[in-house]
Structures are given as C-alpha cells and as structure tokens.
C-alpha cells in the first residue's frame, strides 16, 4: 500500500481509500456482515454479532427439548454466517476485478494523453475464520468503539496476513 501511494497527496490517498472501502463494505453489508473497524487499508468484519440469539441455552439441561431446539438454531446460524462471510469475500474479489478493469482503462486513457495520472491496480487478502468472539463497545469514557476480540478474531487476522506469502487472495481456516 505505502509503495503505491508514497508520493500521492493526503487527499488522493483518502479519496482512493473511501472509494475502495465503499466498494468492499457494500459487499460485506449485502452478505449480512457488520464492519467492525478500518485499520489503514484493512477492513475487519464479523457475521452474526447483531443477532438477538443468546447462548443461554448452554446452561440448559443438554437432554431437554429447549436445549436441542436452541442448539439446532445456533448451529444453523453458525453455518449461515460462515457461508455469508465467504460470499462477501467472493463478492469483494469481483468488485475488485471491476475496479482494476476501470483503473487500467483510466491509466491507458491518460497514457495516450501523455499524462502521468494513473489509478493503481490493487490486490486484497481475505482471512476467514469461524468461532466465538467477545463483541461490544470497548474503550474509555472519552472514546468507545464497537469491536470484536478473542482467539477466533486473532486467527482470522493471522490468516489474512498469510495471503501475501502464500500468493493467495483468500484463506479460510
């Protein structure tokens, strides 16, 4: 990221990031995801965090009908959330392909004019992991942020960072 934009103005970098983030967030939202945070050019998202489903069923007798019903619903949602996260990642790949196609056309048009303007081709890496996370507003009286923390979140982050050395754009654990 820094290599491509090192000589660009702050306004150009922010403009690019806003365009890129809008495209990616749209894919996440359409697949039922919730954006947790932006970290530089990275987006952290989660699925199932705003559902009213409670894990209180785990306190029930495991042989009771109430437990079985709640557990079945919970397992169904876990599978749906995983599929939706993968769907978002695939949609992000397609949105990025469309962006890169337009960026190439823009750059070619400006090369003909002898102008040095260009739009960079970009790649993304998606790291997908399923599991429990602690989710909520965290911080201090001065600043609170909605975020997700936990082992499953850390593994997703490490998985994402493995894309570049692996030569991939999506890794799923």
Label every model-predicted segment.
Residues 78-82, 86, 116-118, 125, ...:
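Catalytic-core segments of nucleotide cyclases and related cyclic-nucleotide turnover enzymes
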Residues 65, 78, 87-90, 94, ...:
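ATP-driven catalytic headpiece of P-type ATPases
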Residues 1-87, 146:
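Catalytic NTP-binding/metal-coordinating core of nucleotidyl cyclase/transferase enzymes
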Residues 94-133, 160-173:
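A short beta-strand->alpha-helix segment at the C-terminal rim
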Residues 40-41, 121-123, 141-143, 167:
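Active-site lining segments that contact anionic ligands and/or coordinate catalytic metals
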């Amino acid at each position: 990221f820094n290599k491509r934009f090192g000589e660009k103005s702050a306004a150009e970098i922010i403009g690019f990031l806003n365009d890129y983030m809008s495209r990616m967030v749209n894919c996440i939202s359409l697949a039922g995801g919730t954006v947790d945070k932006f970290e530089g050019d990275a987006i952290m998202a989660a699925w199932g965090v705003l559902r009213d489903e409670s894990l209180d069923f785990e306190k029930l007798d495991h042989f009771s009908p109430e437990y079985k019903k709640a557990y079945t619903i919970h397992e169904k949602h876990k599978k749906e959330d995983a599929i939706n996260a993968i769907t978002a990642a695939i949609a992000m790949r397609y949105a990025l392909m469309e962006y890169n196609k337009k960026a190439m056309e823009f750059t070619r048009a400006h090369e003909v004019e002898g102008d040095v303007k260009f739009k960079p081709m970009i790649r993304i890496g998606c790291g997908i992991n399923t599991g429990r996370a602690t989710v909520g507003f965290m911080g201090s009286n001065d600043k609170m942020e909605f975020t997700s923390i936990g082992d499953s979140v850390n593994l997703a982050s490490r998985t994402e960072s493995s894309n570049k050395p692996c030569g991939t754009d999506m890794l799923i654990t």
